[in-house]
């Protein structure tokens, strides 16, 4: 589930 966490972080960075 590491990929999901990384993906969520990238989405959060977006405005």
Swiss-Prot record:
Signal peptide (residue range): none
Annotated cofactor note: Binds divalent metal cations.
GO cellular component: extracellular space
Keywords recorded for this protein, A-Z: Blood coagulation cascade activating toxin, Glycoprotein, Hemostasis impairing toxin, Hydrolase, Metal-binding, Metalloprotease, Protease, Prothrombin activator, Toxin
Regulation: Inhibited by EDTA, but not by PMSF. Activity is not dependent on the presence of calcium ions, phospholipids or FXa inhibitor.
An example molecular function term from Gene Ontology annotations: peptidase activator activity
InterPro entries to which the protein is assigned, alphabetical: Serum_albumin_N
Keyword Protease among record annotations: yes
Requisite cofactors: a divalent metal cation
SS bond partners: none
An annotated GO BP: proteolysis
Miscellaneous field: The molecular weight was determined to be 72 kDa with an isoelectric point of 6.67.
Record function comment: Snake prothrombin activator that attacks the hemostatic system of prey. This protein is functionally similar to blood coagulation factor Xa. Potent calcium-independent prothrombin activator, possesses high hemorrhagic activity along with metalloproteinase activity. Has considerably stronger activity than FXa.
Subunit (UniProt): Monomer.
Protein name stated in the entry: Venom prothrombin activator
Source organism: Bothrops atrox (Barba amarilla)
